[in-house]
């Protein structure tokens, strides 16, 4: 039994585990990797939210055109968020504005604090400003 205790004591006096320097080096490496990864992740998340807002607006452009085709006045007068939702129950728009003459409209969606808008139709500029010819852009309705 005494031999077993002496054997155990000799193994405990030997090197085992990591030194403080080795642990600090590993900790510094992990911190550097996190410093690189976290900003990249946040940038990807921001771009995804911006693109989601643009996709929401792009999806609802046909609903706005359908409203105009079905209206008795053949323009966008009276179009609002409720009218778009009646056409497309899955609408994710947050703002719908119509120009003073009813000849143009602005659709807006907000995802994670990022706004996207579309001013249409793609004709001449109305009271809301120049149309967004390339599709939804970042920003809010005027």
PLM regions with names:
Residues 11, 42-58, 71:
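Aliphatic-rich helix starts adjacent to a transmembrane/signal segment
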Residues 62-142:
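Periplasmic/extracellular, small/polar-rich flexible segments of pilin-like filament-forming proteins
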Residues 13-41:
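N-terminal single-pass transmembrane signal-anchor helix
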Residues 1-18:
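N-terminal leader/signal peptides at the extreme start of proteins
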Residues 15, 47-51, 55, 93-96, ...:
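Residues at secondary-structure transition points
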């Amino acid at each position: 039994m005494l031999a077993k205790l002496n054997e155990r004591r000799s193994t405990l006096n030997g090197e085992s585990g990591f030194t403080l320097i080795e642990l600090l080096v590993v900790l510094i490496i992990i911190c550097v990797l996190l410093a690189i990864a976290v900003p990249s992740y946040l940038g990807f998340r921001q771009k995804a939210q911006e693109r989601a807002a643009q996709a929401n607006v792009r999806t609802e452009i046909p609903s706005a055109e359908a409203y105009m085709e079905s209206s008795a006045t053949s323009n966008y007068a009276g179009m609002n968020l409720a009218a778009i939702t009646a056409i497309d129950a899955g609408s994710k728009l947050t703002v719908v504005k119509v120009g003073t003459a009813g000849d143009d409209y602005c659709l807006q969606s907000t995802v994670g604090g990022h706004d996207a808008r579309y001013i249409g139709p793609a004709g001449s500029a109305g009271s809301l400003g120049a149309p967004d010819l390339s599709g939804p852009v970042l920003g809010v309705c005027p």
